[in-house]
Structure formats: structure tokens, C-alpha cells
């Protein structure tokens, strides 16, 4: 079986409900877990409202993972203006240990496929990549310091999708703990570069994990052609012949898909959904 774990922070509830409408483009997924800090009642009271079967999903609260891996909290950095940005990455990495599936797909809900995508070809992971893209130097410094390997490709794996094999997780965890003599989560965060002047840690779980996999096996790649929405009015320019993923790239939350918790309602859901669906 192949599992999918979708990580939904509070401000991404509306994005998740929209992304789930397009799950038919994801091929080969047997079970979906929602990993979240949002109470389960909000999902069960909302999914059916938007045509989704609540029983199709399994729910894991963030606290369940934190209880199992308290080292997650070591990723919280005092004074970090990004809030729980690093913690979310620790949760994803911990989930690879927590879930008992041979193949798993990690996904952020602000990005979803709008063309068919199969994340595994048998036991060969199929990664979305951004060709010839480089991000913060800290991402690649952490790979070298933590794993003892160089960046394996000029392509970028920061796609919001991460297929991973359990057997690769086992070897990676063993490497980290043997190399650094500490829990795997501490081994990673303790070997990250701090930005001069700000003391911030820049880290990408997607780059870290995928570059490791490339040292273990051959992979398949699919170029991610991202339709990046910076305000909802941009949707009218969507063309599924040109793009294969919808990406919420709004810098201001008020320009993005919003969710009202008091009424369990996605603001302007029908308008936004119809605008996207009509272009596919």
C-alpha cells in the first residue's frame, strides 16, 4: 500500500479542502492521512459539506507525533519570525518513521496536481523537480554536514511533494544516528547553518530527503510546471495544457483561500473551485 500524509497547519485548512477536490489526479494512493493541529471535528463537520467522504481520511494530530518524538520541539528557534516553519519540517521527517508503509507521499496542501501524477513506479520514486533551480545555500550546507554527501543534482526538489521508501528511511536514520551519535531529529537540526546577522536556520526537508535517495537508488523525475497564484484573480490565466500543478504563492493570507472556523466554511469556495475546474 502507498500512503499519503498531507500536513495541514491552521491557516491551510481552506487550501486542503480545495486540494482534495483534485485528488483524482493523484494515481496509486491507497490511504490519505491528514496530519494537523486542527481539531478533528472541523474536518468531520466540513469535508462532507464539500463533497468529500470523511471516512476516506485518517487523522493524526501534531501532538501525537510530538508525543512520540519530543525532539520535534528542538526545531523551534527563539525569535524565529517564521513561527513553526521548521517544526513543520520536523513533523514531516518524523512521519517517515511513524507511519508503517513501504511507500509514502508527503504533501503540502497549498500545491496540488492538475494533471495525472503517479509518485511511485513500483518501488522507484517519481519526484517532481524544478530544473536548474537553486535555493538558499543553507539547504545544501545541511545536506553535506548532516549526511556527509554533496548535492546530487542541479535540479530542485522543493515541489511540495515528496515520495519516500521506508527502506531508504531506515538507512538514512541509521546513518544520521551513527554519524552524529544522537536522535535523528537532533542530528539534522544540530548540523544546520545559521544565517549571518539573523541567526536563522534555512533548511529544506525536500532537498535533504531527495538528495539522500539519489545516493541509494535510481529515481524518476517529472518536471513540475507550476502555475503560481499570487492573488486569486490569477486563476483566470490557468491552463492545464501548460501546467501540471496549482501552487498557492500568495504572500498575504488575505489574498489566498481562507477558512472560517466558526462556520466551518471556505470563503467563496464555489467561485474559486469553479474558476480552477473550468480551466482543466
Where do the protein language model's features map onto the residues?
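N-proximal low-complexity "stem/linker" segments adjacent to membrane-targeting elements
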Residues: 1-20
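Short beta-strand/loop segment that forms part of the nucleotide-sugar
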Residues: 29-40, 60-64
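A structural signal for short, well-ordered beta-strand segments and their strand-loop junctions
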Residues: 33-34, 59, 103-108, 112-114, ...
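Active-site-proximal specificity loops/subdomain of glycosyltransferases
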Residues: 42-97
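GT-A fold catalytic core of metal-dependent nucleotide-sugar glycosyltransferases
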Residues: 91-132
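Conserved catalytic core of nucleotide-sugar-dependent glycosyltransferases
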Residues: 117-199
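A glycosyltransferase accessory/donor-loop signature
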Residues: 183-280
